[in-house]
Amino acid sequence: MESTFFSLGNRVKGSSFKSSSGLTGEPGVEEVYLTIDTDEKASFADELNSLYSTYLKTAEQYSLSEDTLVFSRFYIADIANQKTVLRESEIFGILKNSAVSIIQQCPAFGGDVSLLVYHIKHDGHAFRKEVFNCDTENRRNGAIIHGNNYDLLWTANFYGIGPFDPYKQTTEIFKSFNTILTMKGMTLLDSAIRTWVYVRDIDNHYKGMVQARKDFFEEHGLTPDTRYIASTGIEGFSREVHSLVAFDAYAVKNLTDGQIVRMEALDNLPPTIRYGVTFERGTRVRFGDRSHLHISGTASIDKNGEVMHLSNVKKQTERSIENVEALLSPHGAALQNLAYLIVYVRNIKDRTKVMDVLKDKMPSDIPILLLEGAVCRPAWLVELEGIAIIDDSNDFPPFF
């Protein structure tokens, strides 16, 4: 795997992963992740203009385009007051040409908006892409990317609707997601790989989301004996104040037995079902030329499921990194293989302490976004997530 990390000024960091060839001898596809920050001294409109020009410059320099665009997510400080300006901006006008998510999780440094973008390149050839919307205001949206061997489905901005009840809103969201899977010839058990579940006032509403997800999974064959889905459950806010849950997801069509692998590190973290939660610590997806290692939201936990280092955000950050390393290691992967890292901090005043640890413990070239987001237990002060990409060689068709 040819991996490259790059930066453009002090606001853009990126990673690129490309295999030399698949089993057919054809050149492998290239995956590119970008993180872009803004200047806190600018107005929100000016931040968006800056984001637009910075993204265009980066895209031009690294041969990215709307044809290679797969998924993006805006992290903003105040969705209630900034959503309209964002949706009318030039940068949104570009990124809505694939799956695009907007969530309120205030960037810890810089301005009011940060951006994560994912592109796939295949020797300059455009892939076939279907962008779809699931409501009249074009907010619930998604894209299916058609490859030679697999179809990649991304859904975004599935905000909670209905009664002011996290259980009912979560159930409706998963039903809607499952309907899309069915329409695209997929199933939850065979195809769903990764979810992000954002919960408003997580200290009060997480339990209802967890129970709804557990019940839905049991109905669709996701159990401790089969598998769950890699996931992050974190505080975040969608557009409506009465919307308690928001949801992004990723699924892959045409996977076969053996391609989805449960990631565990039992000396560090117990299975989540031990304390009634239904997600994988991590999920490896094996392709013929590479593996994707999806790391779920990972906090300062011990092998018995207890919080470690109460009230010490630096020690919690260190333990979270250790746990990520423990999940990666059995698969021949390390922190350096991460395409990006997202870090959530409960108290934004802890941002410098957390960043000091990240600078000390993480490879310096990994793109990192540090965001405000309370974790599912009040005692957890910080949480990490990301994806690693490594070489693989097997009889499965190569990626994409």
Label the model's feature ranges:
Residues M1-A339, V345-F400:
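N-terminal presequence-like segments and the immediate start of the first folded domain
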